[in-house]
């Protein structure tokens, strides 16, 4: 069994005293997993992994933009419609191109990249398939409004992390020169 921790941001913080408690609780979901894929940049998770001896049986595969990891992400080059992600893996410089420019999709693609490398797929194989990814339906909806307006509806969440995602999505929209947040 492979466990994948995608993101432990501010969403769903209710019920936890702090991020350390949240990280420990999320790790409990993977107590019986053989492998764990995660981002080392979320320090409460990294700390929880190193403190608990019963996680030592886990084969971990980490990725990071800041810390030493199995997949060290270096440069992100965002274009108009795609992003080139460069990294170091097993002392080799590798890269992939993904058809997304928003931060949430980039992070999700890096996690998928790490998982596929951990499973033994070649970077060429991964890159070819990443280029053909299609966006999935998200909670953010872009609708045509009245008087030449575009409306972005985020009906799912109202936490700070969700607001950041919605604002990032808004900045990418080029339909109208002016933007209003309600």
Regions found by a protein language model. Name each.
Residues 136-138, 155-182:
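Active-site beta-alpha connecting loops in nucleotide-dependent enzymes
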């Amino acid at each position: 069994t492979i466990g994948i921790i995608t993101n432990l941001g501010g969403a769903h913080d209710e019920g936890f005293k702090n991020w350390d408690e949240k990280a420990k609780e999320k790790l409990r979901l993977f107590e019986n997993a053989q492998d764990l894929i995660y981002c080392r940049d979320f320090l409460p998770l990294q700390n929880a992994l190193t403190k608990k001896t019963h996680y030592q049986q886990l084969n971990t595969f980490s990725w990071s933009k800041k810390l030493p990891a199995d997949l060290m992400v270096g440069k992100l080059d965002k274009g108009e419609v795609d992003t080139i992600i460069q990294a170091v893996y097993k002392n080799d410089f590798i890269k992939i191109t993904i058809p997304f420019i928003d931060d949430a999709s980039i992070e999700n693609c890096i996690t998928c990249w790490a998982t596929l490398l951990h499973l033994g797929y070649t970077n060429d194989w991964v890159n070819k398939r990443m280029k053909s990814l299609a966006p999935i339906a998200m909670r953010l909806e872009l609708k045509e409004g009245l008087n030449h307006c575009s409306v972005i509806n985020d009906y799912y969440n109202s936490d700070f992390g969700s607001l950041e995602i919605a604002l990032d999505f808004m900045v990418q929209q080029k339909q109208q020169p002016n933007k209003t947040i309600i």
